[in-house]
Amino acid sequence: MSVLQVLHFPDERLRITAQPVKEVNADIQRIVDDMFDTMYEEEGIGLAATQVDIHQRIIVIDVSEERDQRLVLINPELIEKSGDTGIEEGCLSIPETRALVPRAEHVKVRALDREGKAFELEASELLAICIQHEMDHLVGKLFIDYLSPLKRQRIRQKLEKLAKQNSRT
């Protein structure tokens, strides 16, 4: 298992639409395990394969305080959503940035687990928000896309400045 490189905005690879996983096999399971290692190392609660330059429909999530409730969503489909909510979201691909994003309060998804078994899951609150955030990544959408063009431009400038500072160190 290993920690993968997380892509950072404005990297255009974050905009690539992920393709469905054709078969859940040992290679896919290794990707899932590496994604969990990466997410935990980066102190995130969710990670989409797109964020680590793997353009397949794979999401890993763990919103638990203890970091012991792993959720794998392969080829996730949103089948129901209801209610309105929103929290200040952050993203491993957009460091040091948070913004209020409107989301559905409850979702129901269908997906495959790490073993390739189909399941359905109903989620609310933080888990529902995290699922929606990560599913956006699979279609090349970032949480800042919900913001005004001016706010997005300011974030881009801030991150470009951070990248320059980091490249000097």
Swiss-Prot record:
Positions contributing to Fe cation binding: C91, H133, H137
Any one GO BP annotation for this protein: translation
EC number(s) recorded for this UniProt protein: 3.5.1.88
CC cofactor: Fe(2+)
Cofactor note (record): Binds 1 Fe(2+) ion.
Active site per UniProt: E134
Keywords: Hydrolase, Iron, Metal-binding, Protein biosynthesis
Reactions listed under catalytic activity: N-terminal N-formyl-L-methionyl-[peptide] + H2O = N-terminal L-methionyl-[peptide] + formate
Keyword Signal: no
Family: Belongs to the polypeptide deformylase family.
Function: Removes the formyl group from the N-terminal Met of newly synthesized proteins. Requires at least a dipeptide for an efficient rate of reaction. N-terminal L-methionine is a prerequisite for activity but the enzyme has broad specificity at other positions.
PANTHER family per the UniProt record, alphabetical: PEPTIDE DEFORMYLASE (PTHR10458:SF21)
Name of protein: Peptide deformylase
Species per Swiss-Prot/TrEMBL record: Pectobacterium atrosepticum (strain SCRI 1043 / ATCC BAA-672) (Erwinia carotovora subsp. atroseptica)
Gene label: def
